[in-house]
């Protein structure tokens, strides 16, 4: 498949916390959709090795959720570092989208971009500077059409691939119910 500048890159990161100055990325996943939000490619889902010290510094919420999902065990067992995760992800993306073409797509992608900028700059640079943030649409719908909110429920698994799939489904829902296009 030839790279298409109209395709969209969807990304989700799982981190040890919310502060890029002290927390680290522990999982990354990407999907590519066409401009109609049809999934056309799934990138690698990568648990990124971090030290026991980094994992032990996680707060209770992260320990609980990432422990219950099995992510902490996957991170400990992983042999993949951040640079390798970046290289694998970019190798996937190059098949579908030229560098600099796609906005960063997902939920609360401003947070993901902060971590990419700090630890995975080459991957952050692969995206256009714009964001397609589903959470922005959600905030608008919550205020302007609150009854519409009841029609879409997220699982909130805090697993990168499932979170991206839900973000795409959520935008498809808003497109059909709010934008009607």
UniProtKB/Swiss-Prot annotation:
SUPFAM superfamilies in UniProt: Ribonuclease H-like (SSF53098)
Disulfide bonding pattern of the chain: none
InterPro entries: Exonuclease_RNaseT/DNA_pol3 (IPR013520), Oligoribonuclease (IPR022894), RNaseH-like_sf (IPR012337), RNaseH_sf (IPR036397)
Domain Exonuclease span(s) in chain numbering: 8-171
Keyword Nuclease among UniProt keywords: yes
Gene Ontology terms, MF aspect: 3'-5'-RNA exonuclease activity; nucleic acid binding
GO BP term, pick one: DNA metabolic process
Organism superkingdom: Bacteria
Family annotation (Pfam families): RNase_T (PF00929)
EC number: 3.1.15.-
Gene Ontology cellular component terms for the protein in this record: cytoplasm
Active-site residue list: 129
Localization annotation: Cytoplasm
Record keywords, A-Z: Cytoplasm, Exonuclease, Hydrolase, Nuclease
Enzyme class: hydrolase
Function, in words: 3'-to-5' exoribonuclease specific for small oligoribonucleotides.
Cited HAMAP family: Oligoribonuclease
Record-stated family: Belongs to the oligoribonuclease family.
Full protein name: Oligoribonuclease
Organism: Shewanella sp. (strain MR-4)
Gene name of the encoded protein: orn
């Amino acid at each position: 498949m030839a790279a298409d500048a109209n395709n969209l890159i969807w990304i989700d990161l799982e981190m040890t916390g919310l502060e890029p100055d002290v927390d680290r990325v522990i999982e990354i996943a990407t999907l590519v959709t066409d401009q109609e939000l049809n999934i056309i490619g799934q990138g690698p889902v990568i648990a990124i090795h971090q030290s026991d010290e980094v994992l032990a510094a996680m707060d209770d919420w992260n320990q609980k959720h990432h422990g219950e999902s099995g992510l902490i065990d996957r991170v400990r067992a992983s042999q993949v570092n951040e640079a390798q995760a970046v290289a694998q992800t970019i190798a996937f993306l190059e098949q579908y989208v030229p560098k600099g073409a796609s906005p960063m797509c997902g939920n609360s992608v401003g947070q993901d971009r902060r971590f990419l900028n700090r630890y995975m700059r080459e991957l952050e640079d692969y995206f256009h500077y714009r964001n397609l943030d589903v959470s922005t649409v959600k905030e608008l719908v919550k205020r302007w059409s609150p009854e519409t909110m009841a029609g879409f429920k997220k699982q909130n698994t805090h697993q990168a691939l499932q979170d991206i799939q839900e973000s795409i489904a959520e935008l498809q829902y808003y497109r059909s119910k709010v934008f009607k296009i």
